[in-house]
Every structure is written in structure tokens, then in C-alpha cells.
């Protein structure tokens, strides 16, 4: 079990729930837009938010942003240690740094000293695309062993300053390299691990690659926070991350079962399924909901679902646990299903 540490108003590691993290893509100094985006991400289930801090104006904006949101905020720092200090002074709940590009151990120590004084953790780690020259010379390529060694070198630097409030990540854009790196790291440290596939790509490719890597690691008990990194709206990152956790039974949530449709289907099931998902997808209710295009798939094949509908011609069946409850007109099917789900939710 990893060490438990506190980030803002929540804990990670040590048996705590796996936390969903994302990162804003607004200009951090644009406080209004950044807050708006974070609040949307919160509503979808984001539990930790990271913001880039490229300049002093962004670092100073953290105070006003934090005052309007409800989840811990992480400052992402590169190159200038003074940005980290300013972010800490303005209320950052956690700092993410790469000690190798901050400007030497003495500057890292200044960050560590303030992080200790304010009681906030630091995330360090290695990415396959930015390994130190000496590591690449030793291993010839960004192997998992190289990535882990680079990350642990950063950890040892922080530990040399008597600091152990640490989170580690070891990311690659390659699925197998990412998995192997975290497997090695998890055997060599008890610090909490932030898991993700870096630069995973556009929506479909990124979802697939991240789901494979993150899911594989979580099944082994590796990972305390996760981020699905996508070249897309951060809201999609949170939704996909939540689906990964729900799929592995690591988080409560509605599980929607729906058939792929065929010639027997006489309704626009894709539209119906998407509407149901939109209306109930964020409920913290541990049930399975089936949306089937014909009587073949439901309620028979979907009898394991807690509740569902099977569409016909002009009408459909509402069923619970495989037993038909009532016939419903086609136009009323979705609303009736939602009403029944909310009645379950209230109980």
C-alpha cells in the first residue's frame, strides 16, 4: 500500500479512492474562463485540477481561482523556480516540477523549503521524451528502466532535503513502456503514483491507449490518481477516466448497456442511448441500465440489468431484472425510464 498524503481537502494513497485528475487548457491568467472550465470539470467528477503556470501573472491568479472552485489545484511548473514559490504563496495545493529543468539543486531546495512550510506535496517524475542526457547515454533509449531511474533520481534529490511529501509519475506515449515503467516503480517505492499515458493523442486513439494502460495498471493495484490525457476538451478526459474506474468496479456510477443495433431495430437507438446517458450518466448510483433495440436483446439478453427498455414498433417494454413491468409508448420510453431510475436513486 502506498503512503497516504493530503492534497488540499482530500487524501490520496494509503487505500483512499483513486482520484480523477485533469488539466485546464485555458490561459491560467484568464481567471474567469479558467474557473468556468474547472467548475464544469468538477460537475463531471474531476477531483484534482492542474493548471499550467508559465508566468507570474498565472501564478498570482491561483489565489482567485482557488477561491471559486471546490477541488485541489496543482501548479504545473517548468524552468523558473520563482513561479513555484509564487504559486505556493498564492495557495497551490500541490506543485508539479521537473527538478532537471528548474536550475539546479539549490533552486529545487528553495521550492522544497516552502512546500514544507506550507505543508503541500510535490509531484516529480519522468517522461520518456525528456530524459536527462546521462540517463539516455546509459540506457541508449527511453526504456522503462531508464524512465524509472530518472524519476527516482528526482525523488532522492527531494529526500536529500528531508522532504517526503511526494507523488511520482513515470509516463510515456507508448502503452507497453508506460505499463512496464509503473510496474517497476511500484516495486521500488511506496510513494503515491499518478498514472497516465502522456501525449496519448486525439479522442479515439487517446481513449483506447489510455484505457489499456491505466486499466492494466489499476487491475494490479497500481495507481492513486489518474489522468486520461487527450488532445480534446478536458471534459472528455474526466468522462473517460470515470468510465475506466466504473468499468473496473472502482467507482460507483450508472453502467449503460446498449446493443449495437441491426435490421430488427425500428427506432433511432443511438439517439435514445445518448439521451439516456446524457441525463443520468453523472448519477452516483450503482446500477446497470439496458437500452435495447428489439425484444431479442431485451429483456432476455439484458436480464442482468437492474432496469431497461426494449424498443419495438410504436411502443416498447420497460423491464426490471429481466421481468417486464409495463408497455410504454415509444415517445414516452425515455422519460418513463428516467422516472423509474430516479425513483431508484431516491431510495
Curated annotation (Swiss-Prot):
Pathway terms, separated by semicolons: Isoprenoid biosynthesis; isopentenyl diphosphate biosynthesis via DXP pathway; isopentenyl diphosphate from 1-deoxy-D-xylulose 5-phosphate: step 5/6
Taxonomic superkingdom: Bacteria
Enzyme class per UniProt: oxidoreductase
Species of the source: Caldicellulosiruptor saccharolyticus (strain ATCC 43494 / DSM 8903 / Tp8T 6331)
Name of the protein this chain belongs to: 4-hydroxy-3-methylbut-2-en-1-yl diphosphate synthase (flavodoxin)
Keyword field contains Ribosomal protein: no
InterPro entries reported for this sequence: Dihydropteroate_synth-like_sf, IspG_bac, IspG_bac-typ, NO2/SO3_Rdtase_4Fe4S_sf
Signal sequence, renumbered to the chain: none
Gene Ontology MF: a single term: iron ion binding
Enzyme Commission numbers on file: 1.17.7.3
Cofactor(s) listed in the protein's UniProt record: [4Fe-4S] cluster
Amino acid at each position: 500500500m502506498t503512503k497516504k498524503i493530503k492534497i488540499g481537502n482530500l487524501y490520496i494513497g494509503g487505500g483512499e479512492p483513486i482520484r480523477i485528475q485533469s488539466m485546464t487548457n485555458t490561459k491560467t491568467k484568464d481567471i474567469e474562463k479558467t474557473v468556468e472550465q474547472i467548475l464544469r470539470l468538477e460537475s463531471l467528477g474531476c477531483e484534482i485540477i492542474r493548471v499550467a503556470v508559465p508566468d507570474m501573472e498565472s501564478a498570482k491568479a491561483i489565489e482567485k481561482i482557488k477561491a471559486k472552485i471546490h477541488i485541489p489545484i496543482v501548479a504545473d511548473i517548468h524552468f523558473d523556480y520563482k513561479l513555484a514559490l509564487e504559486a505556493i504563496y498564492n495557495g497551490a495545493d500541490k506543485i508539479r516540477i521537473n527538478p532537471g529543468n528548474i536550475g539546479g539543486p539549490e533552486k529545487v531546495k528553495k521550492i522544497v523549503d516552502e512546500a514544507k512550510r506550507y505543508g503541500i506535496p510535490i509531484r516529480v517524475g519522468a517522461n520518456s521524451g525528456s530524459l536527462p542526457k546521462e540517463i539516455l547515454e546509459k540506457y541508449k533509449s527511453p526504456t522503462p528502466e531508464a524512465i524509472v531511474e530518472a524519476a527516482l533520481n528526482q525523488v532522492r534529490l527531494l529526500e536529500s532535503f528531508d522532504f517526503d511529501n511526494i507523488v511520482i509519475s513515470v509516463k510515456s506515449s507508448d502503452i507497453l513502456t508506460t505499463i512496464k515503467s509503473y510496474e517497476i516503480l511500484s516495486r521500488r517505492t511506496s510513494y503515491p503514483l499518478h498514472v497516465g499515458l502522456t501525449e496519448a493523442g486525439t479522442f479515439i486513439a487517446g481513449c483506447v491507449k489510455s484505457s489499456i494502460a491505466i486499466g492494466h495498471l489499476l487491475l494490479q493495484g497500481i495507481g492513486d490518481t489518474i489522468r486520461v490525457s487527450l488532445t480534446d476538451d478536458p471534459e472528455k478526459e474526466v468522462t473517460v477516466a470515470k468510465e475506466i474506474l466504473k468499468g473496473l468496479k472502482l467507482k460507483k456510477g450508472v453502467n449503460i448497456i446498449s446493443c449495437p443495433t441491426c435490421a430488427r431495430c425500428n427506432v433511432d437507438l443511438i439517439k435514445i442511448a445518448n439521451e439516456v446517458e446524457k441525463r443520468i450518466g453523472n448519477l452516483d448510483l450503482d446500477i446497470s441500465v439496458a437500452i435495447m433495440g428489439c425484444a431479442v436483446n431485451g429483456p432476455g439478453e439484458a436480464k442482468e440489468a437492474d432496469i431497461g427498455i426494449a424498443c419495438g414498433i410504436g411502443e416498447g417494454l420497460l423491464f426490471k431484472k429481466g421481468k417486464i413491468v409495463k408497455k410504454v409508448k415509444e415517445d414516452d420510453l425515455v422519460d418513463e425510464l428516467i422516472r423509474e431510475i430516479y425513483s431508484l436513486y431516491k431510495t
